[in-house]
UniProtKB/Swiss-Prot annotation:
This is Eukaryotic translation initiation factor 3 subunit H. GO terms for biological process: formation of cytoplasmic translation initiation complex; positive regulation of Notch signaling pathway. InterPro entries: eIF3h (IPR027524), eIF3h_C (IPR045810), JAMM/MPN+_dom (IPR000555), JAMM_MPN+_peptidase_M67A (IPR050242), MPN (IPR037518). It is found in: Cytoplasm. Keywords: Cytoplasm, Initiation factor, Protein biosynthesis. GO terms for cellular component: eukaryotic 43S preinitiation complex; eukaryotic 48S preinitiation complex; eukaryotic translation initiation factor 3 complex. Belongs to the eIF-3 subunit H family. PANTHER family: EUKARYOTIC TRANSLATION INITIATION FACTOR 3 -RELATED.
Length: 337
């Protein structure tokens, strides 16, 4: 996981609050290249972010990928230390400031992401996780987002209490597990000049495909993932309902046993015999362990994300459908005349 090597990182003596993330173009290109290469193999791309903190800005100046977990001969910790040591020799920022990973069908929220960012953020206070959406970026929309765990989520994870009472006490929901940090991309003046020159050499877009709906794969993937997440949430709800039924049955039996004991103690008191303490009955009914609700909370967040993506995609497709219908009607009217 991405928390491998977090304990070897160093922290900066600066404010823990990060207002925004500034990422160099070189680091962005390396992340994009790595994520797209791994997406072809259906693997999750992960890597380390290097940089420094200036005031309340986290500057990401470089990055490198983590070795694949399937390579048993690779010492992952030694690999990361060697890379950072060599970067230091060539005067490149080598301080560990977080990690990055690719996202699956536009949805990055997961238990593994939460655990990894918790280990990072407790070891490197200013660390962030940068998530790159390969599918959305492949359609021409660069999707690069930075996240940090909220203080409530960190406190909940430290306590290790994921019961419904803990969620209510800390006021934690799927929408308050992570806080999105604004991210900006910065290039050097020479790079900006080169990009301007390249832009002039590119052919003009004639706009032939602006009405392309492209609903086949995108909507299908989101719907499939949404159905899977809904099934998982249903199973979590079934397990929690069974727990509540068992607790209700146990409480009913305990109250019945206590009432019976109270009647027996009243008879013993009338006869002058010693009464039996209620603790003897209570010991027979051990409290049931409360099932953790963290998985259900994360699944709810994934469902919400998929629903938002589907709603956004459908609204854009409906607009294109209305435009296409108008063009088709205009064409038919022209042919009739």
């Amino acid at each position: 996981m991405a928390n491998r090597g977090a304990r070897h990182a160093r922290t900066e003596d600066s404010d823990n609050t990060i207002n925004y993330v500034q990422c160099d173009g070189l680091a962005v290109m390396k992340m994009v290249k790595h994520c797209h290469e791994e997406s072809s193999n259906m693997d999750l791309a992960q890597g380390a972010l290097l940089g420094l903190v200036v005031d309340k800005c986290l500057e990401i100046t470089n990055c490198f990928p983590f070795p694949k977990s399937g390579d048993e001969t690779m010492d992952e910790e030694m690999y990361q230390l060697t890379v950072m040591r060599r970067l230091r020799r060539v005067n490149v920022d080598h301080l560990h400031v977080g990690w990055y990973q690719s996202s699956d069908v536009g949805n990055s929220l997961s238990l593994a992401l939460l655990e990894s960012q918790y280990h990072y953020q407790t070891s490197i206070e200013e660390s962030v996780v940068v998530v790159y959406d390969t599918q959305k970026s492949s359609r021409g929309f660069l999707c690069l987002k930075a996240y940090r765990l909220t203080p409530q989520a960190i406190q909940m994870y430290k306590d290790g209490d994921f019961t419904p009472e803990a969620f209510r006490t800390l006021k934690v929901g799927y929408e308050s597990l992570f806080a999105e940090i604004p991210i900006v991309i910065k290039n050097s003046p020479l790079t900006n000049i080169m990009m301007s020159e390249l832009n002039e050499l590119l052919p003009e877009d004639k706009g032939h495909n602006f009405l392309d709906l492209g609903t086949a794969s995108v909507l299908e993937n989101h719907m499939r993932s949404l159905i899977e997440r809904v099934d998982e949430l249903y199973q979590e709800a079934v397990r929690y309902n069974k727990y509540q039924q068992v607790v209700f049955k146990q409480d009913t039996e305990k109250h019945r046993a206590l009432a019976k004991l109270a009647a027996e103690n009243a008879v013993r008191t009338s006869k002058g015999e010693p009464t039996v303490p209620e603790e003897e009955v209570i010991k027979q009914f051990r409290p049931m362990p409360v099932p953790a609700r963290l998985t259900a909370t994360i699944t709810s967040g994934q469902i919400n994300t998929h629903a938002q993506h589907i709603a956004q995609f459908c609204s854009q497709s409906l607009a294109k459908l209305f435009i296409t219908e108008s063009l088709q009607n205009a064409k038919e009217t022209k042919e009739i005349k």
